[in-house]
A protein has these predicted regions:
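Structural and coupling elements of P-loop NTPases
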Residues: 1-370
């Protein structure tokens, strides 16, 4: 592939949320639907023994929370996806703020019962300052939740951004029936089991007037869905990708990450609309991803990721050109030439040596020099 083709197919984004909104669970299910893992783990579960892929540090497994950003990458339908799962707790917010400088878009997870919470507002302020494109995923619809339109109004008011639902829930809590995808015109039917594999049932319903809708969810919920969709189409403007890319409009999805519902719709739409690697602003000029000279920046240094070794790992975001292993690069601040003999790609704690990396990629390298 050419450099431009490599750039175009990359998507690098962070998942952010207030603590316990389901951020790490959603990340795990995106990995599952993307084919990066075959069985989803859980943050805390008596049924599921496998831990969350992104919570690989011992303290994270003990506490059931994320304390440091984890980076995971996978291929999906021709796109190269890089997910950064960030800490939600305020004590570790600095890690999240640094991570937001290295991503091209963001998915915000909101608990459907609690709505917009304090840490979500703070993180959204950072996104707004950087004009970062935002997608909202309203989670935990399998539990009693606020009404969908109330949640949409709350997101607009509290996060100060226009919204456009691209999926819509059919009830919530004990009567939750599933999610209707307004983007693809299909229905995902809900079952109450915690699914570990990506096998959600999807029914194509291109015309909501079809009697197939009653056959799938019953007369009462079919009538309610038709009314809700009519209201959505009447109240909200059509989805404008340009406004989304400028950080002015947030597409909204509903679902239950732990039960897989709404996750596939989110992933499919994300791959279509999310931005490729964006130009990087510097003190003197804008660096375009397609420039031939390799540039990048270290946005985080993490010590002691491996408990068996005293290590310092630099998280490096590639901004332009092609990164090559064993090639000398100028460290601008020190004026020194640096060579990376064992740069690695991320999959949480797992690592694999890479020979090349392209704009949008997050790589890691051992820090023997001050960077």
């Amino acid at each position: 592939m050419t450099l431009q083709e490599e750039i175009t197919r990359r998507r690098t984004f962070a998942v952010i949320a207030h603590p316990d909104a389901g951020k790490t669970t959603l990340t795990e299910k995106l990995l599952l639907f993307g084919g990066a893992i075959h069985v989803a783990g859980a943050v805390k579960s008596n049924k599921i023994k496998k831990g969350a892929t992104s919570d690989f540090m011992e303290i994270e497994r003990q506490r059931g929370i994320s304390v440091a950003t984890a980076v995971m990458g996978f291929e999906y339908k021709g796109a190269k996806i890089n997910i950064l799962d960030t800490p939600g707790h305020e004590d570790f917010a600095e890690d999240t703020f640094r991570t937001l400088t290295a991503v091209d878009s963001v998915i915000i997870v909101i608990d459907g019962a609690k709505g917009v919470e304090s840490q979500t507002r703070k993180l959204m302020e950072v996104c707004r300052m950087r004009s970062t494109p935002v997608i909202v995923f309203i989670n935990k619809l399998d539990r009693p939740s606020k009404e969908p339109f109330d949640l949409l109004d709350e997101v607009e008011k509290e996060l100060n951004i226009r919204v456009r639902p691209l999926a819509f829930p059919i009830s919530n809590g004990p009567t939750f029936k599933g999610v209707y995808n307004l983007y693809e015109k299909n229905l995902s039917l809900f079952t109450s089991d915690e699914k570990l594999t990506a096998d959600a049932s999807t029914v194509e319903i291109s015309d909501l007037a079809s009697s197939e809708l009653e056959a799938q969810i019953g007369d009462k919920f079919a009538a309610q869905l038709r009314s809700d969709v009519e209201l959505v189409e009447g109240v909200y403007d059509d989805f404008d990708r340009g406004a989304y890319l400028r950080g002015e409009l947030a597409p909204v999805f509903f679902g239950s990450a732990v039960n897989n519902f709404g996750v596939r719709e989110l992933l499919e739409c994300f791959v279509r609309i999310a931005p490729s690697p964006c130009p990087a602003p510097t003190e003197t000029r804008i660096v375009e991803p397609a420039e031939p000279k390799m540039t990048g920046f270290v946005f985080k240094i993490h010590a002691n990721m491996d408990p068996n070794h005293r290590d310092r790992i630099a998280f490096l975001k590639i901004c332009s050109g092609t990164f090559e292993r064993n090639k000398n690069y100028l460290h601008v601040r020190s004026g020194k030439q640096l060579k990376f003999s064992s740069p690695t790609a991320f999959m949480a704690e797992k690592k694999s040596i890479i020979d090349f990396a392209y704009p949008g990629e997050i790589g890691r390298a051992s820090c023997r020099e001050r960077v």
